[in-house]
Design a protein with these regions (language model features):
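Catalytic core of membrane glycerolipid acyltransferases/transacylases, capturing the structured
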Residues: 37-97, 123-136
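Solvent-exposed, flexible loop/coil residues
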Residues: 13-18, 23, 27-29, 52, ...
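Short N-terminal secondary-structure initiator segments
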Residues: 1-13, 58-75, 103-120, 194
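Short amphipathic alpha-helical segments and helix-helix/interface helices
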Residues: 31-32, 55, 78-82, 103, ...
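A broad, low-specificity signal marking well-ordered, structured residues that form hydrophobic/aromatic
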Residues: 23, 41, 65, 114, ...
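Membrane-anchoring hydrophobic helices of lipid-metabolizing enzymes
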Residues: 1-45, 78-83, 89
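Non-catalytic C-terminal accessory region of glycerolipid acyltransferases
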Residues: 35, 60, 96-224
Length: 224
């Protein structure tokens, strides 16, 4: 946890060449395949490892990158987060602007990579799906799946492995190029399953402090 905090802060000052040396992609061609298919990419992300470093992907792909984020009430920390995530020319979209922005991009013919932190806990009143996550049933975000189907995007999960202190390797796993062919919530369930596998391999690199299970006692009867 301490390493992740230090690495997040270091994101502000680390050089591009040093970041490329420390955060490598083993199969960036998975993203290139979707770009060549003339589709946008839905990158389903999680609070695992130094996830803030994923933004260096912009230096390896052709599509522009957009990160979905929730505005932080503390203005200082909000500016800090925006500064970190906007490095390497990544654009930021607040969660409230997401649907309208992505739909407008589709209408304008813009192809992009959209990063969604899909392991966060949604508001209970806007929950559509519950899923066992680390043996506890919780509400799960379905926005990435919904938009990928509506806007015909390729969907990708990425697995980050810590090689040693301050060094990572990321491997992409394409979930689908044709998201509309999947049943409701099937893509979301696949993401959760892949994430569980990743956590089980090295649980110490998951952000356990972000209240992922805060609604565990509110499971509706229909989902029990």
């Amino acid at each position: 946890m301490c390493d992740m905090l230090i690495e997040s802060i270091k994101s502000i000052s680390i050089s591009e060449s040093e970041m490329k040396r420390r955060f490598k992609f083993t199969n960036i061609e998975e993203i290139h395949k979707i770009e060549k298919a003339n589709k946008s990419v839905m990158l389903m992300c999680a609070h695992y490892g130094s996830w803030e470093w994923i933004f260096i992907i912009q230096k390896h792909v052709n599509h522009n990158g957009y990160a979905i984020y929730k505005r932080i009430e503390n203005k200082y920390f909000d500016r800090l987060v925006r500064k970190i995530r906007a490095r390497y020319n990544t654009y930021l979209i607040t969660n409230k602007e997401t649907m309208s922005t992505l739909r407008q991009h589709k209408a304008d013919g813009i192809k992009a990579i959209y990063g969604f932190l899909s392991d966060q806990s949604p508001k209970i009143e806007s929950t559509y799906h519950w899923k066992e996550f680390m043996n506890i049933k919780v509400p799960v975000h379905t926005g990435a799946e919904k938009l990928s189907k509506e806007l015909d995007m390729g969907v990708v999960f990425f697995k980050t492995k810590k090689v040693k202190r301050g060094y990572y390797e990321t491997t992409f796993k394409t979930i689908t190029l044709n998201s509309s062919e999947y049943d409701d919530y099937q893509i979301t369930d696949m993401f959760i399953s892949y994430l569980e596998e990743l956590i089980n391999e090295a649980p110490e690199y998951y952000l356990w402090t972000h209240k992922r299970w805060k609604h565990k006692d509110k499971v509706p009867k229909d989902f029990q």
